[in-house]
Structure formats: structure tokens, C-alpha cells
Amino acid sequence: TRVHQMVRDGHLLAFRRDGVMVVPALFLNGEGVVKGLPGTLTVLRDAGFSAEEMLRWLFTVDDSLPGSPIEALRTNRGREVKRRAQALAF
């Protein structure tokens, strides 16, 4: 399916829950993948993050945003999120 292809291409993250691959609902909106998520995943992957580490980072509250990175992406603050992700690489 299209979702499986997006996971394979690195545009989405999925994890196993009770043996079934799932994509967090917050990664999607009415138009598809949340704007800025694929680029953020690429930056984190290039910084050496595992899929588990990326999921944890995206859902961990960052008081400087405020909120979690995925919440910031969902409210169109992708540049701030991407800057923070890039800073992790150094």
C-alpha cells in the first residue's frame, strides 16, 4: 500500500504493537502526512537516530517549542523543529 511505501522510503515511521505495524495517528492529518515530518525524519536519520529514538524525540515535550516536536509540526512550526533536529547532529 501507499503507507507501506512511505515507511520504506523513510517518509513515515511505523512500529510494532502486538505484532502489527502501526503509524502514529499524529503523523497524519486530513491531507496526508504532516508537513515537515519527512524532512525532519531525514535529518534525524542522518544524525544517527534509530527509529525508536526518532519516535521518542518526536513525542517528548520540549519546553522551548513549547510542546513536543510532533505537536509543533502539526501547528506549522516545522522550521523550529528542523533547527532543533539539525542541532542534535552536532
Which residue stretches match the model-derived regions?
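Non-transmembrane "mature" sequence context
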Residues: 1-90
